[in-house]
Amino acid sequence: MAETLPGSGDSGPGTASLGPGVAETGTRRLSELRVIDLRAELKKRNLDTGGNKSVLMERLKKAVKEEGQDPDEIGIELEATSKKSAKRCVKGLKMEEEGTEDNGLEDDSRDGQEDMEASLENLQNMGMMDMSVLDETEVANSSAPDFGEDGTDGLLDSFCDSKEYVAAQLRQLPAQPPEHAVDGEGFKNTLETSSLNFKVTPDIEESLLEPENEKILDILGETCKSEPVKEESSELEQPFAQDTSSVGPDRKLAEEEDLFDSAHPEEGDLDLASESTAHAQSSKADSLLAVVKREPAEQPGDGERTDCEPVGLEPAVEQSSAASELAEASSEELAEAPTEAPSPEARDSKEDGRKFDFDACNEVPPAPKESSTSEGADQKMSSFKEEKDIKPIIKDEKGRVGSGSGRNLWVSGLSSTTRATDLKNLFSKYGKVVGAKVVTNARSPGARCYGFVTMSTSDEATKCISHLHRTELHGRMISVEKAKNEPAGKKLSDRKECEVKKEKLSSVDRHHSVEIKIEKTVIKKEEKIEKKEEKKPEDIKKEEKDQDELKPGPTNRSRVTKSGSRGMERTVVMDKSKGEPVISVKTTSRSKERSSKSQDRKSESKEKRDILSFDKIKEQRERERQRQREREIRETERRREREQREREQRLEAFHERKEKARLQRERLQLECQRQRLERERMERERLERERMRVERERRKEQERIHREREELRRQQEQLRYEQERRPGRRPYDLDRRDDAYWPEGKRVAMEDRYRADFPRPDHRFHDFDHRDRGQYQDHAIDRREGSRPMMGDHRDGQHYGDDRHGHGGPPERHGRDSRDGWGGYGSDKRLSEGRGLPPPPRGGRDWGEHNQRLEEHQARAWQGAMDAGAASREHARWQGGERGLSGPSGPGHMASRGGVAGRGGFAQGGHSQGHVVPGGGLEGGGVASQDRGSRVPHPHPHPPPYPHFTRRY
């Protein structure tokens, strides 16, 4: 195996007593060594003993080379085991007397583990798919030291005279391979001693020794009896070991057989040849006891092997060869030289057996009719006594099979990195793990890996399934299922293989009849368990087919037929009343009945079940069809509902899209409308603002017009007022015009007086208005009154000349003073009345010049004739004349004039030719003059600008 746990290689208490000189050493070629020898050599060197024969041979060759020996010639020990076995038996007796209890426990744990070893070794060496064990881990000691098979032969020879020793030997022999050479007397003794443990009647001896039996066995050759029986012998081994309370050596022998069991699959049919010679020498009692004792250990192995079949393997042939080779192990070591001689033939037969692998697994062939017929005859003679012997063992084995079958778990979907230790750690959370292995297909290394785990109880296995099925391990989803037992496939392939070798194996001993019966009982139990686990419709169909095949008659009875792919089997059982074999197809409830009822009642009930099974099969088929129809109907209904839902969803989505588009359009329309309304509102607001602005402007315009109208009205009022005041003095003025005092000659004098200061053109009198003549005289009187003493200070008339600068009149026409004076006079008059009137026209200039002359003339006439009131009246009278004046001496000119400082005087503060004297600063009624002061003492400081004005009148 891949891992050998500590202690597996120890000899144990039984071997401790062996003398060192017991074994004799011989030299054999490496290619001649069997797997068991290879493993023994590897174990001596503390090397790994796992793998098939080629791997072991390669490993051993490498080790031998490292030791410096010839790898082709290797020295191995050929043990002479007579003393060894004797000591072992004595030791076994002593230990039995001590009655140690832990043997049962160890057997328990070893039981499942041994099953696993056997089954997985078969798995490992499958002919079809070459399943190989990647990794394994086991709880109990898995293998025992290699004991020579010679010792098993010598045991009986040396101890058959003593019944006590024979009893002890019989307790231990079942653990050893069942083939031993015994003489007739020894056989009788062993039969007698076997009655200590089993109810074997003396008749069995006679029936077994009948010559008829020998003929039958010769006919049968080796067909399908010895190998399955040996296989079952391993299954029956453990309960018997417990019953007899055999301690250390006994257990070690069982482990040794396990080692053989695991080793022999590689050797295949090579060992069948030597088995025939061994069988000729072996005793029937030994075979019976070995069968009884080995049976339960193999049963779980069958389950394991069937569990491996899902990987696509064909374990049947390999299992059969494993079982047969298990039995042959001792005889081969006993007669190694004879074994080697027929080995080529054996290999040929092995190849032939492999050729039939597919047939064995896939169909139920009618080939073994001959063997089954002879086997039936064989059974007639031996069945009655054997049944009595086997029943207690069957019950015990039934319990063990029931418990052991459910303990094996098949784990699929493992990661390639998963090791057996990982599986063991994982499954040990939910119970005790007896053993765990990881297998894969050796031919395709990248293939999927599978795990095989054996728990201590089926309850723990169930718990593991419930907790670990469909869980994740190393990134992969694992499936945990109970392992299914399909032993019948193995039997079928055994039969085919045995038929191929019938000629070579014809010298089989009489003990086969006993083996056949026990084998059948074991097969029935295995089939019951298997039926419980996999009663499927396909199995039922196959079973029906098998039954049709079986019905023709008792000659066509096969011991066990199985559909390799389905797992339904038939069993041949001896009917006591008729003395002939009866074929029955088992159902799930058979195990309980077998333990409580007699054999004939069992066969009757089985026949009834055969009849019932057709109806049941039909019902099952009908139910299956009905379920299928219902499933299809439900599926159709679900599909229809799903399509309806999808249609509705599509329609709903379409309507939603349509509605959404409509809402979007409406939203756009509303948005456009809102924008239009907004634009209209803004337009309205703009128009409103415009209207208000126009309204304001209109109002302002109206106010302005109103103000102008008021101004005009006020001016008209003022004019009317002045005109109303003026007519009171107009008669005086008019009269004065005609006055004799206004002669032309007077003007000559005035002109003469002011000729330097007032040069005038000839047309100076053209625009003279005689109507206004009187006002100048009043004004002149007013001025003359206050300014006569100081001419330079009081010549007011000289200060009104600024107006003429404004309207651009030529300065040469008049004197500067007269221009300034009259302009200033008009401006001052306007200022005093608070009205901004346009400056006086040009005509006012002549009036001003003429007025000066009038003033001077009248000043001489009337000194101080007028008072201040007359001056104010003069202002009002002159207003009308100045109203028509226009020009630049308007508001700005008016604003620059000074105000009146005292009584009647006019201050000139505007812009003049020379120095500026502000009019506001004058006091005491004097009129400030800009350029008059120097003119009085010098009346003519400058030459007259116009010479033609210099003439005097």
UniProtKB/Swiss-Prot annotation:
Residues 98-114 have a biased composition (Acidic residues). There is a cross-link at K65 (Glycyl lysine isopeptide (Lys-Gly) (interchain with G-Cter in SUMO1)). SUPFAM superfamilies: RNA-binding domain, RBD (SSF54928), SAP domain (SSF68906). GO terms for cellular component: cytoplasm; extracellular exosome; intracellular membrane-bounded organelle; nuclear body; nucleoplasm; nucleus. The modification Omega-N-methylarginine is found at R897, R903. Residues 318-329 have a biased composition (Low complexity). One of its GO terms (biological process) is regulation of androgen receptor signaling pathway. The modification N6-acetyllysine is found at K616. Residues 600-953 are annotated as: Interaction with SAFB1. The modification N-acetylalanine is found at A2. Residues 1-29, 91-114, 219-404, 525-665, 684-953 are annotated as: Disordered. Its main location: cytoplasm. There is a cross-link at K230, K293 (Glycyl lysine isopeptide (Lys-Gly) (interchain with G-Cter in SUMO)). Expressed at high levels in the CNS and at low levels in the liver. Expressed in a wide number of breast cancer cell lines. Residues 224-233, 292-308, 345-358, 383-400, 525-551, 567-579, 590-665, 684-820, 843-859 have a biased composition (Basic and acidic residues). Residues 30-64 form the SAP domain. InterPro entries: Nucleotide-bd_a/b_plait_sf, RBD_domain_sf, RRM_dom, SAF_Modulators, SAFB1_2_RBD, SAP_dom, SAP_dom_sf. GO terms for molecular function: identical protein binding; RNA binding; sequence-specific DNA binding. Binds to scaffold/matrix attachment region (S/MAR) DNA. Can function as an estrogen receptor corepressor and can also inhibit cell proliferation. Interacts with SAFB/SAFB1 and SCAM1. Interacts with isoform 2 SRPK1 and inhibits its activity. This is Scaffold attachment factor B2. It comes from Homo sapiens (Human).
